[in-house]
Amino acid sequence: MSRKKAVILVSGGLDSTTVIAIARSQGYDCYTISFDYGQRHRAELKAAEITAKAHGSLEHKVIRLDLGAIGGSALTDTSIDVPEEETSGIPVTYVPARNTVFLSIALGWAEVLGALDIFIGVNAVDYSGYPDCRPDYIAAYETMANLATKRGIEGERLHIRTPLINLTKAQIIQQGLALGVDYRLTVSCYQANDGGEACGKCDSCRLRKQGFEQAGVADPTRYAF
């Protein structure tokens, strides 16, 4: 009997690395995909490749896109500063249409592979307030995916799996550690240096640091200071 196949979106960060481990623990053959989309640094892409290999990815793809061409985000436009204090509302680190674009390409690869499951590490608890990380968005995207694909209209239902959606950052870390995730290999910082060292000031660093504190485990993050 052949194993189930899944496409896993990986960024090299804490959440998506945990998702690979979860998918493997659920018996999936994992095919991982990352995106070089014009983000501020490439350290996360290196981390994505390393963590995908560490968790047994059968194939890892890096898709090149230029979301910086449309701008509108501090992650793709260096003229917009990454906030180093908590802000209200949707922050400037939100990348317009990012998850929609990423999921669509992952969906295409899933069709080619014959995979019916796509995993993404979105979270609606300890997160930055991005609209494309909400349960309503994921449910709507899954509906669209089943209307827009050959296998979907032939009755083989595709699923967008979001195992972290209702977990706190501390719970994510605890689950990952139980599955053998080495968080030293991950890069979460919005403005990490070329060596993957974190700024310790951005929203992503704040949530990550808070998560390790609340989980009661030492923070393995390498900081630039």
Swiss-Prot record:
Q: Which GO terms describe its molecular function?
A: ATP binding; ligase activity, forming carbon-nitrogen bonds; zinc ion binding
Q: Which residues bind ATP?
A: V10, S11, G12, G13, L14, D15, S16, T17, T18, V19, I20
EC numbers for this chain: 6.3.4.20
Required cofactor(s): Zn(2+)
Sites binding Zn(2+) sit at C189, C199, C202, C205
User: For this protein, what reaction is catalysed?
Assistant: 7-carboxy-7-deazaguanine + NH4(+) + ATP = 7-cyano-7-deazaguanine + ADP + phosphate + H2O + H(+)
- Cofactor stoichiometry and binding remark: Binds 1 zinc ion per subunit.
Q: Which UniProt keywords apply?
A: ATP-binding, Ligase, Metal-binding, Nucleotide-binding, Queuosine biosynthesis, Zinc
Q: Does the keyword DNA-binding apply?
A: no
UniProt GO BP: queuosine biosynthetic process
Q: Which Pfam families match?
A: QueC
What sort of enzyme, by top EC class, is this? Answer: ligase
Q: Pathway it belongs to?
A: Purine metabolism; 7-cyano-7-deazaguanine biosynthesis
PANTHER family for this protein: 7-CYANO-7-DEAZAGUANINE SYNTHASE
Role summary = Catalyzes the ATP-dependent conversion of 7-carboxy-7-deazaguanine (CDG) to 7-cyano-7-deazaguanine (preQ(0)).
Q: Which family does it belong to?
A: Belongs to the QueC family.
Q: What is the name listed in the Swiss-Prot or TrEMBL entry for this protein?
A: 7-cyano-7-deazaguanine synthase
**Protein source organism:** Cellvibrio japonicus (strain Ueda107)
* Organism placement in taxonomy: Bacteria, Pseudomonadati, Pseudomonadota, Gammaproteobacteria, Cellvibrionales
Q: Which gene encodes it?
A: queC
